[in-house]
Amino acid sequence: MSHALSKHFSLTTLSLAMAMALPLVAHAQEQAVNFNIPEQPLANALQAFGQQSGVQVLYSPNDIQGLHSTRLNGTFSAQEGLAKLLQETGVNYSFQGNAASISRKSGDALELAATSVVGQAGLGVNTENTRSYTTGAVTIGKSERSLKEIPQTVTVLTAQRIKDQNITTLNDVYGLVPGVVTYGALNGDNQPYARGFEIDNFQINGIPIPAGTSTGITSLNWSDLISYERVEVLKGSAGLFQGAGSPGGAINLVRKRASGDFKLSTVTQAGTWDNYRQEVDVQGALNEEKTLRGRLATSYNTRSYFYDGGKSKRASTYGVLEFDLNPDTLLSAGFTYQNADNRSTMDWGLPGYKDGSKIDFKRSTNLSSPSDYNDVESTQYFFEAKHQLNEDWKATLATNYTRFNLDALYSNTGGQIDPIDNSGAYNWAEGRGENNYQYNTDLFVNGNFDMLGRRSEVILGANLSHSKRVAARYEVTDYNRAYDFIPDILNFTPPKYARTKKYRTTTSTLDQQGLYGSLRVNVFEPLDVIVGARASWFDYKQDQLNETNGRHTKSDMQTNAKVVPFYGLVYALNPNWSTYVSYAEIFTPQLNVETVDGSALTPRSGDTYELGLKGEFYDGTLNTNFAIFRTTYTGLAQRDPNQPTTCNCYVAGGKVRSQGFEAEITGRVMPGLDLTAGYTYNTSEYVNNPNNPDLEGTTFQTSMPEHMLRTWANYQLQGEYSKWQIGAGSTIQSGVYGRHVGGNVGKGIKNETGGYAIYNARIGYDVNKNVNLSVNIENIFDRTYYSQTGTIESNSYYGNPRNMMFTMRTNF
């Protein structure tokens, strides 16, 4: 086979990037080279690659126009380095002697000659169209880093895994991440927990979005994934780039990007309980030069549930424009719109008997009123600018504006229920409404430099956010009857209610600012040292208005220049394995609790120690992680023991601890077989509890299973059956229990739930290169179990019975 130009291009369109710093030598692609090439326009990156490797690079300018490289840092052969550099670009490469040829995958630029090495660009940051369960790098720490380089545990849900396991919302994601559980209602707004603590640190494209119960105004938990191509979950304290929050971890949602090539995809689904969903996603260049690109994706879902009366409608639209202002500057702007209308979606779950035994409810039981509703709407606008300052330095500016509205009527049925005659339950209801908005801005620079002869990386930045929330509470019709006790919980039909007059309005504002920095130094060849710190300013104000008597109750809390550090060591044992140790902190403001003198309680403080071992194999397509961790949370609010009970006074005297072990493997283990498996062992305890010393030494997070195993594997059959895929997975966990958190807690009655094992499966078939048909089956053996366990009074939920989802995916 000989070199030949495609008919589409003439010889004069070929560009030649040659080695300038190193002499040309035969078989240069086999020699190890220490590369340092930042993310930048691909033409510039290929020039730097040629200079650093001594390899000639041939390409057509039209083939790489509008494309950007990924970051390449480390020691690789020229072949390995070029593969990593071309990740996400959609181009092929080939070597012949000391020359590398670049072409579009369609082959319309060059007919490649016979070569000594032929390869395809491997995994990068973007996981779309990689068909991989892992990623080459993540961005949850501001810069692109492989999982092996990060001294904390990070789990990634890639685009392919989201498709294979039929995941459509962020709340669905929580059920797949090892060691993560959720608490909350069945309307999709469940709060995730990891390692015994709440995860209330959220990011979008690496930009902090205060969204948790302790620091945020809006909620992201119910978000549709139509806007995002992957989800990154970091476990442990994450205060360095985030600011205030709990020590459970952080979640980074990464938006889909626009391609310069026209692509159209659709997803059509139909499943159990009248579950129907449609997606349409279109993208492509908007000018001939492909410097302006756009993408528009939309989804609509309507469904019922396995319990009586529950149903919902959800709609989402995502749009983004990307513009190459010049070879060094990329601008992005867009929006995400989402709304959900939920009806009778069981916001408070099921109760148990007061002696801790289970009530024999049918799985279809719904104790919510038929008039219950929960309607939410969210609109977000975003802008991002990335500028390559030079070969080593890059600046990023990102800003978001979000509006979030809620209109709801909730009812709850629970109480101290007698196991003899089923009496003792009550029914309660109220209306709610919220109007919230939030601004977030982040500006940072990151780059590489030499320090004492060693290559180093620094990140310096600042971010700020402003949020306002106006939350109203409403009475309902037959309000006095709402607290009537129910004579028999097993023969009870919830009444209908209607929202009436407003009785309370709470206005909250939250301002956060932060300065942060991180330095990573390669002290000597196998060892990287990472040090970082963040100074945070936090200002929370609340004004609660009693609409009945006009009385205002105001409170505020400020934290000034609160500093949290981060320290980490990463030691490369060999090209495949690295070991690490890290220490991270975070703080959590304690809102609406005061000391006896009226001053705000000092923030809670969380610190996490972690020691681990990470592996990367098969050119980064398989990643492993083993970690032991300990998180201590101090300064929890406790009622002041030196003051009378009539004084609503607190001291920061509580202390809890969580510790354990995690193991995870994700990626391709053999041709056609992608899998993920994660095991978590986690215990927690009260270390200090002045209000109830009986609790000390007992379990703190009782609803977190001590043992949890989550697995999933998908196999693309080989040979003549290669159009078929089969998948299977499981969720296996030990028992949990719920108990009261007030009163005589140490002697409280437990609501215990045993462990369970749930198995799922998938079968897929490629009709042709454009169409795939599949069916997903959840809970194959139709196991009856509780997916969430509350106290004896409420908040226990059955898990989904066996159900199926049929899917047709098209790609053009």
Please place each PLM-identified region on the residue numbering.
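Acidic, small-polar-rich N-terminal luminal/periplasmic segments of exported/outer-membrane proteins
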Residues: 51, 56-58, 71-73, 113-261, ...
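Outer-membrane beta-barrel translocator/receptor signature
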Residues: 210-211, 227-229, 240-319, 325-329, ...
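Acidic/polar loop-and-plug regions of large Gram-negative outer-membrane beta-barrel proteins
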Residues: 301-305, 317-388, 403-436, 479-504, ...
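Structural signature of Gram-negative outer-membrane beta-barrels, strongest in the C-terminal barrel
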Residues: 322-324, 436, 455-467, 506-633, ...
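Face-selective signature of the C-terminal outer-membrane beta-barrel domain
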Residues: 381-404, 428-545
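Membrane-embedded beta-barrel scaffold of Gram-negative outer-membrane proteins
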Residues: 386-390, 394-400, 404-410, 579, ...
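Gram-negative outer-membrane beta-barrel transporters
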Residues: 525-526, 651-741, 781, 811
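C-terminal beta-signal and adjacent terminal beta-strands/loops
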Residues: 731-743, 764-812
